[in-house]
Curated annotation (Swiss-Prot):
GO biological process: positive regulation of transcription by RNA polymerase II; regulation of transcription by RNA polymerase II
GO cellular component, one term: nucleus
SMART domains: HOX
Biased composition (Basic and acidic residues): 75-87
Name of the protein: Retinal homeobox protein Rx-A
Organism: Xenopus laevis (African clawed frog)
Keywords, ordered alphabetically: Developmental protein, DNA-binding, Homeobox, Nucleus, Transcription, Transcription regulation
CDD domains: homeodomain (cd00086)
Gene (name only): rax-a
């Protein structure tokens, strides 16, 4: 039977004097007396009587033996108590760490910190995403699914089950296919609406066909008879033509337009080619400056010739040296 630590301290087993009383080196009759065991004899007197018998040579050996004996007694007392204590129980002195290992006694909060570290490591590791195997549809299955989608975008459960049996697919796969197909259909509808809005916007008006110009509107407003009839020879019809150059006010009244703006030639040029056939041959020769065959029909050719002569004389006068 092992005694508790207070009883051991009382009878002096942990003290140097108690060990000296039990050491085999001393006298058994004097050291193991009843008074020494019960503690009636003072330790100082026992130590004094024993130290007088011990030689100085054996003093170091006695100290070493006493230290070893004390450690051996302490281990013998602690280990049997750990065997009898269960988890969560305490001994008679309320020490909750005697039934635990040395690492738990030294650092009771170490286990909780280790568990917290494990939890934090598990949280830091990214969770693996569950990947579902993608279903590969055959051409026949896609054809039947598209036909069913054209009939109804939201088929009921019975229709989906019949279609699933027809195409040899699970009903869940058919339902997911219809969901994805409806999403695709909504995206297409939105794209069509946005494209129509962009076409109607004024920003893209420059891409359209150009508007008819004012000149074409003016020409279209003129009657065709005025272009085809020979009344174009008068001045009012010539002035109504687009691009007609009138006589500047600074020129004298005797000025006449050049012969290539002859009303007869203009009328011939404005007639359609289908009615007129090939254009008339060019009348002017090589010496167009000196010979003006078209002016012979014009009664005002004398005034034009006089003006040209004056222009030539002026050019010759400028070119002469002083």
């Amino acid at each position: 039977m092992h005694l508790h630590s207070p009883s051991l301290m009382a009878d002096g087993s942990f003290s140097l004097s108690g060990h000296l009383l039990r050491s085999p080196g001393g006298n058994p009759s004097r050291l193991h007396s009843i008074e020494a065991i019960l503690g009636f004899v003072k330790e100082d007197s026992v130590l004094g009587s024993f130290q007088s018998e011990i030689s100085p040579r054996n003093a170091k050996e006695v100290d070493k033996r006493s230290s070893r004996h004390c450690l051996h007694k302490m281990t013998e007392e602690i280990h049997p108590q750990q065997e009898h204590l269960e988890d969560g129980q305490t001994d008679g002195y309320g020490d909750p760490y005697l039934g635990k290992t040395s690492s738990e006694c030294l650092s009771p909060g170490l286990s909780t910190s280790n568990s917290d570290n494990k939890l934090s490591d598990d949280e830091q590791q990214p969770k693996k995403k569950h990947r579902r195997n993608r279903t590969t549809f055959t051409t026949y299955q896609l054809h039947e699914l598209e036909r069913a989608f054209e009939k109804s975008h939201y088929p009921d459960v019975y229709s989906r089950e019949e279609l699933a049996m027809k195409v040899n697919l699970p009903e869940v796969r058919v339902q997911v296919w219809f969901q994805n197909r409806r999403a695709k259909w909504r995206r297409q509808e939105k794209l069509e609406v946005t494209s129509m809005k962009l076409q109607d916007s004024p920003m893209l008006s420059f891409n359209r066909s150009p508007q008819p110009s004012a000149m074409s509107a003016l020409s279209s407003s003129l009657p065709l008879d005025s272009w085809l009839t020979p009344t174009l020879s008068n001045s009012t019809a010539l002035q109504s033509l687009p691009g007609f150059v009138t006589t500047p006010p600074s020129l004298p009244g005797s000025y006449t337009p050049p012969p290539f703006i002859n009303p007869v030639s203009v009328g011939h040029a404005l007639q359609p080619l289908g009615a007129m056939g090939p254009p008339p041959p060019y009348q002017c020769g090589a010496n167009f400056v000196d010979k003006y065959p078209l002016e012979e029909t014009d009664p005002r050719n004398n005034s034009i010739a006089s003006l040209r002569m004056k222009a030539k004389e002026h050019i010759q006068f400028i070119g002469k040296p002083w």
